[in-house]
A protein has these predicted regions:
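Short, positively charged, Gly/Tyr-enriched micro-motifs
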Residues: 37-83
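Short, conserved catalytic/metal-binding motifs centered on acidic residues
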Residues: 44-46, 71-76, 110-118, 145, ...
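Hydrophobic, well-ordered beta-alpha structural blocks that scaffold small-molecule cofactor pockets
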Residues: 162, 200-203
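A short acidic-Thr-Gly-centered motif at the start of a beta-strand
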Residues: 97-105, 172-185, 200
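Conserved small/polar residues in nucleotide/adenosyl-binding loops
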Residues: 205-211
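Electropositive, glycine- and tryptophan-enriched low-complexity nucleic-acid-binding patches
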Residues: 134-181
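Dynamic "connector" segments at or just before major functional cores
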Residues: 1-50
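Active-site-proximal, Lys/Arg-enriched surface segment
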Residues: 79-146, 150
Length: 214
């Protein structure tokens, strides 16, 4: 079985699980309770399979996938808002943990860490929540991710809405990996880009794991 097919089946199984749904639905008393065209699992699969085409084209394509009556883009957007972002976070972490990780460097996994910034849609809600100062014109997010270089996949990410300290996010991510049952006993070498070195980060990683700081 191809890896892509296995991941899709794993995601479908998780998204269909009642316990998983109850953790990640915004309003457990009313969301996805009545019989509707779109189920929780449907919305998950739509969101993951979105190719960033115009909304109505994506809706038409997904309607054909469901072999059901045509579903509007507005209906998909409304249904997506009923699911917490934590659902996708857990799906990402679980599928990454189950992926093959056979390629190593002299027995070590090579993990590279880097950060990025991005802009969010300039809506009143996001501007109110994520603009930290009056001078902020556009709501932004900050993310730091860990990439398994030899196995070519992301294994962990940390997001912060607004301006963040990349070193602090990297430390939290390292702690999460170090405590994760899938990774904690694996020999690892972590590689950090030039924006990460500092006295605190060097001291922290030196005590925690083998590290290369650019």
């Amino acid at each position: 079985m191809k890896a892509e097919t296995r991941f899709i089946r794993q995601i479908q199984k998780m998204a269909s699980d009642v316990e998983f749904q109850s953790k990640h639905i915004r309003d457990g008393e009313k969301d996805f309770k009545r019989t509707r065209k779109l189920t929780f699992s449907d919305v998950i699969m739509y969101t993951i399979g979105n190719t960033r085409s115009p909304l109505e084209l994506e809706a038409q394509r997904f309607s054909k996938y469901l072999t059901a009556d045509e579903i509007s883009g507005a209906a998909l957007c409304k249904a997506r808002q009923k699911i917490k972002y934590t659902a996708f976070e857990e799906l990402f972490e679980q599928t990454a943990a189950s992926a093959p990780k056979d390629k190593r460097f002299h027995g070590y996994h090579l993990y590279a860490v880097d950060g990025m910034k991005g802009e969010l849609p300039k809506t009143p809600e996001l501007s109110t929540k994520y603009c930290e100062t009056e001078k902020c014109k556009t709501p932004v997010f900050h993310a730091v991710s860990t990439f398994d270089i030899l196995n070519e996949m992301f294994i962990r990410s940390k997001f912060h809405f607004g301006i963040a300290d990349e070193r602090e996010l990297a430390g939290k991510m390292i702690d999460a990996v170090a405590q994760d049952v899938y990774y904690k006993d694996e020999p690892q070498i972590w590689i950090f880009d030039r924006g990460f070195p500092s006295l605190s980060s060097v001291s922290y990683t030196h005590l925690t794991l083998p590290t290369i700081l650019r």
